[in-house]
């Protein structure tokens, strides 16, 4: 039986390099941890919490892998280019790119921030990564059911701007699939329900007391951070699923796509 805390076989990613955006905490951090446990060299990306990122890096290095920590504002083109220049200098190439970072519920970031981060920045990161990605590499985009199904299934008002912008990002990335396939690069969308223990779930619960319990009752189970991160890690190595989409957990409450 597979250890749920070690979802990928030790050594299965030896010699590979993986970059996870927004990986100093939460789903991104656990995804990076699983890659390191499997032997991959890892790039930890963070926006403004360097000590937290460095602490994680020290933990991952105990697996015997190389870890690069790079701070970058993904909405800033120069910052993104600088990040990939560091990656190229350190590792030469990239085998796995996980587009995990997202946002839009933060206060004081402006009305367009959600779209800038969840759509525009995702494309910006992909474009900057392409010269380092080669035949056999994989790009994974992390989203939520509330965003993936936003066109057909309403969500909480507080989450609508995030959901719409993440769906816009997903659509924009899907338009790149033919180009990626021509280069031999796989693309997978991983969509999950509300994830217990995430900042987003906490903020939604604060705005809608009882929201998590209600959703858990409807779904039967809500994944926690580590469990969902394991699905993201598997999406980076498993065969490409139908429609390039890995749906995690219950989707019976959602209609269409």
Residue ranges of model-derived segments:
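Conserved glycine-rich cofactor-binding loop
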Residues: 17, 24-26
